[in-house]
Structure formats: structure tokens, C-alpha cells
Design a protein with these regions (language model features):
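Small beta-barrel nucleic-acid-binding modules, principally OB-folds
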Residues: 28-42, 168-180
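HotDog/MaoC-like acyl-thioester-processing domains
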Residues: 36-38, 44-122, 181-183, 192-235
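Intrinsically disordered, low-complexity segments enriched in polar/charged residues with Gly/Pro
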Residues: 29-30, 55-58, 74-76, 125-127, ...
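Acidic/His-leaning functional-site neighborhoods
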Residues: 132-217
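Hot-dog-fold acyl-thioester-processing enzymes
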Residues: 1-32, 81-83, 90-171, 223-235
């Protein structure tokens, strides 16, 4: 779902001529720093059509907030919704730039805000329930040769216990991306089971610097149809 949202974000920015390949000519780069997503307990199939609705809900001097909904195309049943935070990075100075040049290009729709834009503060656990190391490979990289933001999510969720995966499905996820990492770097993921039933995943680099924080919450899996029911669908 994160992939579909990011692809839709790229398409929206392309329409407004401020996509990654547009602003790189001005030595600028899009950087996603946070995403919050709520996921409904529903079963989707590979052959189903769905729609991603996306819009800018707030534009501040340094941040762009983009909200989204993913719905089934046939009945508009909600599959997932959320919000994201983006910044513009100057490639020469490695500092954040203002969003002034976007003001006349993007339409802001604040009344459709799907979630609060107030920064979520993660708890600081005193102990960890699991520790896992991961060495970044080429499969983890994006087109900028950094570890992809989606790779951090994949690595973090590998620390979820098997018994949870066997009976539950993801209900919500909050991700903070803090620092870049690269090929062959070793990432350490510390997982803690929080009192409210959520799981906190903290990824650090070899220097112990936190590069990504993720909070996942899980819910009971919906009833899954028999294989025969799936095969008999009118596709």
C-alpha cells in the first residue's frame, strides 16, 4: 500500500511539473520523512481494481502534507487511509528548502485532512523483546542508491513474532525516517512490545544513530474464503 501511495504521489507531482525529475534540475530533491496509515481488516485479491485518492492537505514553510485514501473501485469500500509529510532538500547544501515555489502549483484541501499533522512521539522502552541485524544489499536500494524508505518498513516488520503473523493482520503503521543509509551498512532493529499492544521498531546504524522509527498495531485477520471460492470468482 505504501508503494501504491508513493507511486500516486509521484504521478500527482508530475502533473504539476514538480516531480523528482523536474526539481532535480534545480538541485532539489523530494524527501519523505513521515507516514501514518490505517488499514481496514479486509481481504484484497491480485485481480481487483482499486483507486488511490491523493491530495495536499497542508503546506507550511518547510513541510508538505499529503493525505490519501485507497478504495475498491467497484464499491468504494475503504481499504486504507493516511497522511504523509514531505520536505524539499537542497542537493548542494543538504539543507531543507522552503516550499515557496510550490505555493502556486499545488492546491491545498485542508478540509479533507485524514489525520492530525501533530508529530507523534514514540515511547522510549527500557528493554527490547527482539534484536535483529540486517546488512543492506542492492535489493534494499532505491534509484538514488540509498536504502529505500520501503525497505526500512520491511526490515522492521520482520521482527514481528510468528504467532502474531499467523492470526493477525496490520491495522496501522506510523513511520519516521530520520537518516539515510547505504549499501553494505549494517542496520540493527530493536523491537519492543508496548503496553497498548503495539510494537515499536527502532532501526539504528553501526554508530548507534537512530535512522528510522516505526510503530505497528495489529488486529485479528478477517475471515479468508476457501480456495474454491476465490477460483470461482467472476474475473
Amino acid at each position: 500500500m505504501l508503494m501504491y501511495f508513493q507511486d500516486s504521489f509521484a504521478r500527482l507531482m508530475t502533473i504539476h511539473h514538480v516531480a523528482a525529475f523536474d526539481i532535480v534540475k534545480q538541485h532539489r530533491m523530494w524527501v519523505i520523512t513521515e507516514v501514518q496509515m490505517d488499514i481496514r481488516p479486509t481481504v484484497t485479491y491480485w485481480s481487483e481494481d482499486f483507486t488511490v485518492e491523493i491530495w495536499v492537505s497542508e503546506l507550511t514553510s518547510l513541510r508538505i502534507y499529503c493525505d490519501f485514501r485507497i478504495v475498491r473501485k467497484d464499491n468504494e469500500q475503504l481499504i486504507a487511509s493516511g497522511t504523509s509529510q514531505w520536505n524539499i532538500l537542497n542537493l548542494d547544501t543538504k539543507r531543507l528548502e522552503t516550499t515557496d515555489f510550490l505555493a502556486d502549483k499545488l492546491t491545498v484541501v485542508p478540509e479533507l485532512m485524514t489525520a492530525s499533522h501533530k508529530k507523534v512521539r514514540f515511547p522510549k522502552p527500557q528493554s527490547f523483546d527482539m534484536l535483529m541485524e540486517h546488512r543492506a544489499t542492492r535489493l534494499d536500494l532505491d534509484f538514488n542508491f540509498h536504502v529505500s524508505n520501503r525497505s526500512y518498513v520491511t526490515i522492521a516488520l520482520l521482527t514481528i513474532p510468528d504467532e502474531v503473523l499467523a492470526s493477525q493482520t496490520l491495522a496501522s503503521v506510523i513511520v519516521h525516517w530520520l537518516h539515510e543509509t547505504y549499501l553494505d551498512e549494517t542496520l540493527t532493529c530493536h523491537m519492543s512490545h508496548i503496553d497498548d499492544g503495539s510494537y515499536l521498531h527502532t532501526l539504528t546504524n553501526a554508530e548507534g544513530i537512530v535512522v528510522c522509527e516505526l510503530m505497528s498495531r495489529w488486529q485479528q485477520q478477517p475471515e479468508i474464503p476457501e480456495v474454491s471460492e476465490v477460483l470461482n470468482r467472476d474475473l
